[in-house]
Amino acid sequence: MPQSWRVQHGRVTLKTLEQLSQEDWRRFFSYFRDREIADWNGAKPTRYPFWLFKKLMLDDFNALERFSFGMYDELEQFMGSVELYDLHPYPPATPKIATLGIVIGERERWGKGYGREAVRAALEFAFSRLPSALERVRLTTFLHNKRAQAAFKAAGFRQVGLHERTDHTDVLMEISRLEWVEEQEQGSG
């Protein structure tokens, strides 16, 4: 069983999945069934029943195949999730690289800085809270998702490439632990 973590940055608190209430789980599930949110994440809305969605998420979390968090605002209201997944090398080896994913399911929170703060909290976890800190965190976002790119850049990510697909272009971004540490020392994180 993984350790319970709680990481805060600014107005955002991240809590590991076993800390989510049943109501939080229901909201979480609703985000994955929402067409617009799925589109922004390059996915299709989940068709799983609630019980299976929750089981799959907890199974991955408990197997340490990903680090998953519920995202809460300053009033402790659930508003989304952050994950570090696609761990390399794959556990049980000690991972050094992960991919970051974020979903803000509450539309009234979009464009208000919560994403940037959640990403900064996830980077603090990845680079300073894990017993064996990651060396690099990467992500992919759509070229047309300028709001996400701005949030990721504000959290310290840099663009490292573009990936042309048949129907869209992905922006590849990453940050190393060394870059993150330098930002913390300069006081910009």
What are the language-model segments listed below?
Residues M1-Q22, R33-D34, S68, L75-G189:
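Acyl-donor (CoA/ACP) binding surface of acyl/acetyltransferases
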Residues M57-G70:
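A short helix-loop-beta-strand connector motif used in the catalytic cores of GNAT acetyltransferases and
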